[in-house]
Amino acid sequence: MRHRNGLRKLNRTSSHRLAMLRNMTVSLLKHEAIKTTVPKAKELRRVVEPIITLGKNPTLANKRLAFDRLRDRDIVVKLFAEIGPRYATRPGGYLRILKCGFRVGDNAPMAFVELLDRPEVTEAVEIEDAAE
């Protein structure tokens, strides 16, 4: 019986699944929004949320744990300098999963995964005066 085995295998070996989720975690923390399939997004949430919780308390032990899970120094620095303090008062629920239709090739359900309360990036739009 598979009772209480909530892990999604995603049709991968355990090492492939671990590497894929690690890479997706690094990409999400780097870009703060990624597009992936819905099952991968739901499994990614189980990995990313505890790592962001580590980032809220910048002790040496937590930094070592985060590096052990992420294996990217720049992302660990960003986690403890920017992302952790941003969610200091939020008790969990750092991600938003938005369904965005189906992939063209195989009709897989797709989703955007984004960090909540991320800074809005607006591009400067030049306005040309009609008088010129």
From Swiss-Prot:
GO terms for cellular component: cytosolic large ribosomal subunit. InterPro entries: Ribosomal_bL17, Ribosomal_bL17_CS, Ribosomal_bL17_sf. The keyword Nucleus does not apply. Gene3D superfamilies: Ribosomal protein L17. Transmembrane segments: none annotated. GO terms for molecular function: structural constituent of ribosome. It holds the Pfam family Ribosomal_L17. The keyword Cell cycle does not apply. Keywords: Ribonucleoprotein, Ribosomal protein. One of its GO terms (biological process) is translation. Part of the 50S ribosomal subunit. Contacts protein L32. Belongs to the bacterial ribosomal protein bL17 family. This is Large ribosomal subunit protein bL17. It comes from Dechloromonas aromatica (strain RCB).
